[in-house]
């Protein structure tokens, strides 16, 4: 609904899709929009993702799963995803939106270019809902697909 409402409010015509894939929603939207641009289905796309899990139900679920950090006395250092002493994540809400555009189209209109997306890949491990497989096969396939595209 959000993508449809935004297109109506701002007169955004062309491909319109709302993808929901949990933590990867924003990344998947970037990849799908990039592919639409590469396939000449659009010159420019508005993409993003949002998450609001800080609700009683969301908090209760993550607490029951013991997924949240217990370092409540030091919230600034509680989030440490790559640390051997990590003990969970810090729950937060957020959103991000960006404009993706065909490079030639952006140059033609004099747009400020912040970065160029040169590939996208996605894959799944078929291992666990949140943990990657120990061999990293899904991540390797994802990177391989990004390099191919």
Question: Where are each of the predicted segments found?
Answer:
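Condensing-enzyme catalytic core mediating Claisen C-C bond formation in acyl metabolism
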Residues: 73-149
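Beta-strand segments within the central parallel beta-sheet cores of soluble alpha/beta enzyme folds
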Residues: 16-21, 42-50, 112-120
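A glycine- and small-aliphatic-rich helix-loop capping segment at beta-alpha/alpha-beta transitions
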Residues: 36-39, 59-72, 134-138
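Glycine-rich anion/phosphate-binding loop at the beta-strand->alpha-helix junction
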Residues: 44, 49-55, 61-64
